[in-house]
């Protein structure tokens, strides 16, 4: 599950992990017995001190062939507020809101594709 989190200025929230290169949309796995929306709220809280300011909308479900042929990624779009700045920790090295015209260096190719799809600048793909 990934979340495209926008603030009131229309900026996108991205995270840079300690264990992977590049900038990503926040998100993570869904635990057994956990709903997608529960996972979304947990991940945005953990990765950015974010709270939903709008109802999350399912944008698309992608097949991700990177790890297996059974991995599906649900991408949600929502507006958020940040309760306090996110300090770096063992998982998140850096995070922040970015204007779509001024993304940080190192945004992953998949993240750039998702942002283009969300903006209506690219056709929605079926594969992550």
Where does each model-flagged region fall?
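A short coil-to-beta-strand element that immediately follows conserved catalytic motifs
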Residues: 51-60
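Short loop segments at secondary-structure junctions
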Residues: 8-10, 79-84, 100-102
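Conserved hydrophobic "DFG−1" position in protein kinase catalytic cores
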Residues: 5-6, 14, 78, 97
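Active-site-adjacent beta-strand/loop module that shapes the phosphate/pyrophosphate-binding cleft
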Residues: 61-86, 96, 111-114, 119
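Conserved N-terminal beta-strand and adjoining loop/helix that marks the start
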Residues: 1-12, 61
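Nudix hydrolase/Nudix homology domain
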Residues: 21-22, 90-128
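Conserved Nudix-box catalytic region and its N-terminal flanking loop in Nudix hydrolases
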Residues: 7-47
């Amino acid at each position: 599950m990934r979340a495209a989190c926008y603030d009131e200025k229309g900026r996108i929230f991205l995270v840079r992990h300690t264990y992977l290169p590049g900038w990503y949309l926040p998100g993570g796995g869904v635990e057994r017995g956990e709903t997608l929306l529960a996972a979304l709220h947990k991940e945005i809280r953990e990765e950015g001190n974010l709270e939903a300011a709008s109802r999350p909308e399912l944008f698309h479900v992608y097949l991700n062939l990177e790890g297996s042929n059974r991995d599906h990624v649900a991408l949600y779009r929502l507006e958020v507020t940040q309760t306090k700045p996110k300090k770096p920790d063992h998982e998140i090295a850096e995070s922040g809101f970015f204007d779509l015209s001024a993304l940080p260096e190192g945004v992953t190719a998949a993240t750039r594709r998702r942002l283009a799809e969300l903006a209506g600048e690219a056709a929605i793909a079926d594969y992550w």
